[in-house]
Structure formats: structure tokens, C-alpha cells
Amino acid sequence: MHPPFPQPTVVRADHDDPDRPLVVLLHGRGSDETGIIGLSQHLPADHSYVAVRAPIPAGGGFAWFANRGIGRPVPESLDQTMAWFRDWLDPLAPVGRPVMLVGFSGGAAFAGGLLLADPSRFAGAAILYGTLPFEAGVPTTPGRLAGAPVFLAHGEADTVIPADLLHRTWDYLLGDSGADTYARKDPGGHAITSEAAAELADWIMKRS
């Protein structure tokens, strides 16, 4: 059982069509759903898009988990918020409807946690300018994501996410995880670039 988090607050890009693949957008720590929903304007129109507000108040916005440090979730907290998220997702997208996760920063760690916890549940995940949740109660063993589609984008000048976590995420997703990873590095910092958004759109379209 997870704590009594509020019912998820969501914003949709358009009317949800249950016959379309669902793309769930996950914002960064201290932000909310209203910022990241704009990314959907740059992504394929034949998908349904929904942005979800994280359940934990943090920094004038919201967070997906309690931290032991930037990019390092408290395992119990991550487990609780993932259970809360799945309680919301499963009625909306029963097994059989493709679901892709797109997470930025703290939302990337949350998306990674969901994928690592249950790789077969998701049609893919985009890890944007963030880290996977290592030592956070989800498996990061060799082959854990065998064949799973992953889009990975990092900024070479990112000063928000610790460099060791960025390197570890890059190495794992392009190596031991077994994921089918498309990866790019931008010269900039901790922000989604227009080039990354365009490549993400192409990646989503090719996996529909």
C-alpha cells in the first residue's frame, strides 16, 4: 500500500483516443504537468498524450520521489509513487494498449524506474537529461531491458545531474542493460533541445 497520495492531476494534449498508443509525459522535480505537455506539440499527431503531476510537493512544484541526493531516489519512496502511478495508468491503458514514457530530469529517473520494474509493460521510454534510479530498489542487472526501446538524450554541459550518474546511465543503457537504445548528446545543458525533440518524434513514430 502506498501513502494516501492525491488523485493524479493530469493535462491532455487532446481528447484521449483509446485506440491510439498513449504517451505519458513526466516532468522534472520542482515543476508540474503544465510545462512538459507542450512537448507533445513536437511529437507525432497520431498518438494520445497526457502529462501527469507528480504526487510529492517540492520546490514550488512537485516531485516523483524523495531524494537521497540529486538523481538518487529513496527506494521506499520510489516504490510507493510507482504503485500510485500504476493504479492510475492501468484502467486508462489496459494491457494491450501501447504505453510509452517520456521523462525529463527527475521524470526521467521515474520513467526509468517504471521500465526497470516492469519492462514488458511499456512500449518504450525516453530518458531525457536525467539518470536511471540506481540503488533505488529496481533491478539494474545485465540484460534487464533486453530489447526494450529506449531513447536517451544527455547534455554535455549539464550541471544539474551529477556527472557520475549521467555516465553510468549512458554506459548501462548502451551496454549491459540489453536495451535497444538510441542515444544522443547535445552540447548544451539541462534542457530539451529542438533537435532532441525532433529526433524523439522520429523515434516514437518508428515504434508505433
Task: State where each predicted segment sits.
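Serine-hydrolase catalytic machinery in alpha/beta-hydrolase-like enzymes
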Residues: 2-95
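Short, proline-enriched alpha-helix->beta-strand connector loops that line the catalytic pocket
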Residues: 20, 97, 145-150, 179-180
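Active-site signature of alpha/beta-hydrolase-fold catalytic machinery across serine-
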Residues: 38, 113-117
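Flexible "cap/lid" loop of the alpha/beta hydrolase fold
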Residues: 61-68, 130-150
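Gly/Ala-rich beta-loop-alpha elbow adjacent to hydrolase catalytic centers
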Residues: 102-107, 111
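A conserved short beta-strand
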Residues: 120-133
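Short beta-strand/loop motif that positions the catalytic acidic residue
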Residues: 151-154, 158
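C-terminal catalytic histidine-bearing segment of alpha/beta-hydrolase fold enzymes
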Residues: 164-208
